[in-house]
Amino acid sequence: MTTSLYWQTEGEGSDLVLIHGWGMNGAVWQPIVEKLSSQYRVHTVDLSGYGYSAELGSADFDEMVAQVLAQAPEKSAWLGWSLGGLIATQAALTAPDRVSQLITVASSPRFAAEKGWRGIKSAVLSQFTEQLKEDFTLTVERFMTLQAMGSPNAKQDIKQVKRAVLSRPAPNPSALATGLTILADIDLRESLSQLTMPVCRMYGRLDGLVPIKVAHDMDAFIPHSTKVVFEQASHAPFISHSDEFITELHRFLQPEDEFLI
């Protein structure tokens, strides 16, 4: 069965797909879409179970990737934030001819911590899963707060994310639960060497969900990739440091151009 996700397309230029993270929806990109649309044809999606795709319910990891690929442009750059980074990476591995460049933001091929690998402790993920059953709205709000922790403008960042996300229908609780399972279980580390397109990895140095050590450990997994660290950012650098973020993104996507914001 083909399931149609909700997409928005704005601007003119080369195609750029933006994929949101857990508990969020495509509206989270709106502040930067306005700036990017002067240079790119920007495609934002609400993943299955989120925003205007909430009624589609839950989809597992491979289904989510297939759903996005089914409606994405024939060939474009893909940018995934957090959980969206896993989806963008898997799409690049599954259909390398469709992904011209891969950008991951505040993402990790393995979100869960384990011996020798920094990440989210399994107890924290379990706690979120339990809290979801009691009050999923409050759980998503807590997650937003966790994302902005460490950022100098944390309160402002949370407010902006919340406003954008709450402008669309609430996420489907089963999709939220599936998303946490993906964050707990998926491990793409051993597949990363198969990536054939240019890769850019962006991180916030103060990120509490994707520790900065992951950024450095990843150098060994994708040695020829571009690494960008936003020194004062946490988990959402495209919100807290949008101008710097867009400059770095453009530098990677179109290195021959000078970009004026």
Curated annotation (Swiss-Prot):
Pathway: Cofactor biosynthesis; biotin biosynthesis
Signal peptide segment: none
SUPFAM superfamilies named among the record's database cross-references: alpha/beta-Hydrolases (SSF53474)
GO MF annotation list: pimelyl-[acyl-carrier protein] methyl ester esterase activity
EC number: 3.1.1.85
AB hydrolase-1 domain segment(s): 16-241
Localization: Cytoplasm
Function of the protein: The physiological role of BioH is to remove the methyl group introduced by BioC when the pimeloyl moiety is complete. It allows to synthesize pimeloyl-ACP via the fatty acid synthetic pathway through the hydrolysis of the ester bonds of pimeloyl-ACP esters.
Quaternary state and interactors: Monomer.
The protein's name in its UniProt record: Pimeloyl-[acyl-carrier protein] methyl ester esterase
Source species: Aliivibrio salmonicida (strain LFI1238)
